[in-house]
Structures are given as structure tokens and as C-alpha cells.
């Protein structure tokens, strides 16, 4: 995609970088300069994660030119946020909690134009169905994959490589996940189906001033 302005990814996530690369989007990285990443009080979780992505983009745009892209992902079970595990024992406890259950993955992004100081924020929700897991399944997974840097202690790309992701993909029968409702890329860390139209629209005409959040 040929953008009229350089795209700056304000995220250290290797998964988000992979998604952009897989979809032919050129970018460079800038540091995320938002140091307080707590969700704003009083907002529903989906609104809260959009607000957080917005705050990340605005903070990270300091001294930067072009388009700043930020994102944040929440793994939510029974309205409780599962963050990144602090230890392998913590990871095992998270996967045990997810076993046989359905949880939601909410990812929001904000694309911020540093020239007009305006931006667009979008979010998506994917429902993830976990199989009933035996203790051996959990132990095998946490010792075979890097789980400490992933919210909820799992990565969908470990279960189904992104090169195979499509509408009709088949998840292996022995995988942790039985099926998903919604976007694979959203679970991986960036709802690319929502981002692409925003980028394409931006290349055709300048965004109107004012922050849009829907």
C-alpha cells in the first residue's frame, strides 16, 4: 500500500509488525510514550481499550511526523481482564481458567495524523472457544511456546500460523482452541480488516479535523 505519509507503528509487538508486513504495509517503529496504560474509569471495556489506543497514539506522536498507529488488546473472561502472566505458574492458571470456556479478545487501534492532529479509532471483538484442556495439554503448551509476553498466556499464531489464516481455515483437532467467532488477526493483535479501509481512505483524501471514535 502506497501511503501519502510515512506510517509509524507505536508498538513493540512483533505480532502487529508481522500483520502489517503480511498485508504489504510499509512502516517504521516509534516508541510507545504513554507510561500510564491503565484503562479510564467508568468506561465499558471496549470503549476503554479504544480510549487507551487513542491516548497511546497522541502521546507517541510527540516529535514524530506522518501517521502514528497504536493498538492495544484485552483478553476478557467473565468481564475480567487477563493480562500477561507473571510466571509459568500464572500462565498455567490462566489457561486452566480458559479451558472449556468462551472468552473475548478486544483489540483497538488509533491512526493519528500528526499534521492535522486528528485521528480515527476502531475496535473489534472476537469470541474464542477453548477446548477442555487436560493438565498435560497446558504444561506442554507453556513449555513449548513463549507465553509470558502474551495476554491470556496464549498466541493464536502458535495454534494456527498466520500464513494459513483465512475465512475457511481449519484448526487442528488437538489445538487449545476449538473455533473462533470473528477475526483471526484481531486475536493476533490488530483488526486489519478495519485498518485497511482507514488507510485507503486516508490516501485518497485528507481526514476531516476532529477525532472520530465509534
Explain the meaning of each model-derived region.
Residues 1-67, 80-81, 133-136, 143, ...:
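N-terminal polybasic phosphate/anion-binding patch
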Residues 121-206, 213:
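Active-site oxyanion/phosphate-handling segment shared across diverse enzymes
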Residues 73-76, 105-112, 155:
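Short beta-strand scaffold segments in enzyme catalytic cores
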Residues 63, 98-105, 151:
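Short arginine-rich
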